[in-house]
Amino acid sequence: MKKVLIAINFDEGLFNFRKELIEALIAAPYEVHIALPDGEYISRLKQMGCIFHETAFRRRGKNPLEECRLIARYNRILKEVRPDVVLTYTIKPNLYMGMLCGIRRIPYVTTITGLGTAVEGTGLLQKLTQMMYRMAMRKASVAFFQNTANEKFFADKGIAPGRHRMLPGSGVNLEHFSYQEFPAEGPAEFLFISRVMKEKGIEQYLDAAEAVRKRYPDTVFRILGFLEDDFEGTERFQRMVEQGIVRFEGSVEDVVPYIRNSQCTVHPSFYPEGMSNVCLESAACGRAVITTDRAGCRETVRDGETGFLVKERDSADLTEKIMRFLEMPTGEREQMGRQGRAYMESCFDRRIVVKHYLDAVVQLTAQQ
């Protein structure tokens, strides 16, 4: 049986966004190996049929010794597994596993799930990462991108020319994220679903919550996600939670019940996204989305039809769009969500994404 190795940085992301791909690969059939740090979703991935290779590393770590250990671990896994095709996601697997696959002449497919702060910019770290990407993707068979801005960035840098392909993000599972009836009764509720960190726009969300509740005091602003250790606004955040201005639920396994009770998802991110899964999932459930007018976010919304686009890092603009939504009749808010669901069905069905990957893997293994 042919072997496919998937290298990624986070078990929750692999399970939540690529479970359907794994199911399709196993059914094909391929022997599926996964290399990533241990976590609570690993047992479920094993139950699906994946063979787990623990690969401990810190996603944001910059210790050279730790990075060398990771490269050595990846090399041992390649020796042990002898995969026919490797799929890589996120920066460190893309860079290190990509370079090793190129050296070992193993076909590999790289996915750019967003530039990330280590790539976007002009600093020394960004220049080094871009240089490493050029080396890592030199022999990539396919380079998948989730938005045109990211693809253009790599094209302008001359990275993996001629092998770029576009995907509608990770897509969205339209069965799990099914349409949810609109909550016509009770106070309007807004939802922020993300890691609590500056780049995800939490400060703008807090600013908007304060401003909106002065005019509409019954409005609910809820937050789902874990609090990043290095978030500098922790003191203000905790104070606003204690005052009841926002409601913090922490990290939850299933966001659907929270989306069901909300009227709109707010995602004011200025993080270099590939394609915002938060926006896709919320729209699939039939909820309006307010998000930033930047790559990875703007593609998920038809401005004024399925939600609103706002300027990056602009609390006043975000507040104005939330106010505009609140001043719409209930029927128009509901219709905005229904149109979002239709948009997801036509353009972002995860089955589209799975087919792209499966076609690439089948083609590469057939050539061997």
Where on the chain are the PLM-derived regions?
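Conserved acidic donor-binding segment of nucleotide-sugar-dependent glycosyltransferases
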Residues: 302-304, 308-315, 324-330
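Acidic donor-binding loop of glycosyltransferase active sites
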Residues: 260-274, 287
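Conserved donor-binding/catalytic core segment of Leloir-type glycosyltransferases
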Residues: 181-200, 206-209, 222
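A short, well-ordered alpha-helix in the C-terminal region of glycosyltransferases
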Residues: 218, 317, 324, 331-347, ...
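Nucleotide-activated donor-binding/catalytic signature segment of Leloir-type glycosyltransferases, i.e.
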Residues: 234-252
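Donor nucleotide-sugar binding/catalytic pocket of nucleotide-sugar-dependent glycosyltransferases
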Residues: 134-179
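Short hydrophobic beta-strand element within catalytic cores of glycosyltransferases
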Residues: 288-291, 301
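Glycosyltransferase donor-sugar binding loop
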Residues: 36-40, 172, 193, 220-233
